[in-house]
Structure formats: C-alpha cells, structure tokens
C-alpha cells in the first residue's frame, strides 16, 4: 500500500512540477519581457507591440499544429511525454537568450528579440501543449485525475507566484544596479530550474493509458471545428480573455514604475494576481457540482467584468 501511495504521489508531483516549470518562464514573458525590451534593451515600443502581436498570432497557429503532431505521435514513452524531454533544454536556453542584450544596433536588436521571442514561444508550445493533453493518458480514475489537476494547479500557481514576487528583487541583487545584467542572470536562474524540473517530470510520470483513435489531418480537423458553433464562440471568448490578460500583465510594470513611482509594489500586486485566482480555481469544482458549468462561467465573467469596471473607474 505504501509503495502504491509513493508511486501515485511521485506521478502527481512529477505532473505538477511540469506546470511549475512552464509558469516560471511564462510569467517572465507575460510580466517582464515587454518592459525588458523597451526600458532595458531600448527598443521602440511600437515595434515591440507589433512583435508581440505577430508572435501571438503565429503561436496560435502553432498550438493547433502541435495538437495534430501529438495525435500522430507514437513512441515507447507515449504520445505526450517525449516532448518534455525533447523541449526541456532548448526551452530553458531560449528563456535565457530572450533576456540577453546583444551588442547590436537598434535594427539588429529588434531582429534578435523577434527571433528569440518567437523561438521561445514555439518551445513553450512544444512542452506545454503535450503537457496539457497528457492527463487522459495518465489514468482512467476520475478521482485521480481530479487530484492530478489539483496538484498541477497548486504547483503551477506556485511557479507563477515565485516569478511575480522574486523577479525584481533578484534583478536588483544579481545585477547590483545594472538591470541588463540583473534580468539576464535572473533568466539564467529560472531557465535552469525550468529545464531541471521538466527533466524530473519526464522521469517521474508515465502514460499508463493507451487511447486508440483515427489519425487526424489538418483538413479534417478544420472541417470538424467549422461545424462546431459552440467551439467558435468559446474560442473567441478565450482569445479576448487572453488578450485582456496580456494587456494587463504587460502594463503592470509600467504602471507602477511610471505612474505610481514605486517598483516595490509591482512584486506585491503581481504576486497577489497569481495567488488570488488560485482560490477561485479551487472553488470551481464545488460550484460546478451545484450549478451548471455554463452558469458558473457566466457568473464568474459578470463578477470579473464588474471588478474591471470599478477598477478602471477609480483610475
């Protein structure tokens, strides 16, 4: 019994730290990369914004293609698990390179930033999409799936909170007043940890369930999705939600740096913005057991909209 419990928790923690790894890099991108480009690397804000828009659009296509790759993958390690091993080292390396300032002119820096950011986004897709798709292959037990998801949420939120709270203090400590060096060394810390944890995750999880399905082509997938109106409505909603998320997180550092004039508040607010949603996430299963999921979503959206309205009104 003890061995079974040990094996279960080994997989649970192995599954969860993969999300922790992804969030170490994801939070660095969403919270600090734009600020790094404009205020540390010295790139024009217009071109940085355009670069982020283009990369996000390309990344959306890459997500769909990665799903098709997973559907057509068959190895001795399973369908999803191999990509944690394949992507671990390049993922951490590109995180580091994205926060490096090369000795180029403005045009050279723009090209360097675009290439490294685009490659980092591809590598995030390479490890994160398979990780997100992995759960059905780990177990058939619905309770164990719930436990795995809970551990993932907890550790993923921990990773996001660590980056939100620790990044700017690390930049100051490691850079000793030089933001260029500080961001680079901080990226080295998070990149190395992310790579290590992805390798540990690969080592400690196993795809125990074999799901047989017909191979899917891009054309067949598009025909199927085109006929699915609820999917299109939900996809538009997700697009708008993530657009708002990137706008808020990208502006957070600028807001406290230029408008409030207190950089220390950035870590506090960014940390709370990753921890507080965790409480909401943990209440969803309880609410979903008492209400229709659609109603839960509508109520939560209404609360969020009202909160944003009040916040913007005060500002």
Task: Show which residues each predicted segment covers.
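Membrane-embedded alpha-helical bundles of multi-pass transporters/translocases
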Residues: 2-314
């Amino acid at each position: 019994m003890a061995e079974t419990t040990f094996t279960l928790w080994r997989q649970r923690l192995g599954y969860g730290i993969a999300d922790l790894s992804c969030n170490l890099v994801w939070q660095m991108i969403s919270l600090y990369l734009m600020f790094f480009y404009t205020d540390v690397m010295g790139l024009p804000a217009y071109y940085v914004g355009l670069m982020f828009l283009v990369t996000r659009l390309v990344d959306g296509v890459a997500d769909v293609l990665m799903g098709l790759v997973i559907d057509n993958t068959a190895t001795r390690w399973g369908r999803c698990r191999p990509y944690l091993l394949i992507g671990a080292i390049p993922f951490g390396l590109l995180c580091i390179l994205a926060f490096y300032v090369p000795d180029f002119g403005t045009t050279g820096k723009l090209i360097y930033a675009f290439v490294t950011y685009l490659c980092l986004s591809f590598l995030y897709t390479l490890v994160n999409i398979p990780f997100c798709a992995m759960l059905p292959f780990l177990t058939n037990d619905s309770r164990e799936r719930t436990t795995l998801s809970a551990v993932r949420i907890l550790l993923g939120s921990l990773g996001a909170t660590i980056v939100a709270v620790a990044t700017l203090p690390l930049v100051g400590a490691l850079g000793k007043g030089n933001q260029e060096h500080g961001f680079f060394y901080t990226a080295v810390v998070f990149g190395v940890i992310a790579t290590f944890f992805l390798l540990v995750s690969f080592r400690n999880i196993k795809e125990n369930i074999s799901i047989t399905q017909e191979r899917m082509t891009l054309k067949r997938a598009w025909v199927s999705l085109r006929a699915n109106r609820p999917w299109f409505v939900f996809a538009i909603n997700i697009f708008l939600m993530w657009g708002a998320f990137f706008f808020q997180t990208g502006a957070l550092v600028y807001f406290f740096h230029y408008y409030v004039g207190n950089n220390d508040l950035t870590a506090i607010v960014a940390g709370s913005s990753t921890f507080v949603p965790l409480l909401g996430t943990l209440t969803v299963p309880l609410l979903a057991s008492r209400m229709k999921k659609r109603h839960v979503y509508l109520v939560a959206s209404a609360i969020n909209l009202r909160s944003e309205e009040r916040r913007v009104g005060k500002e």
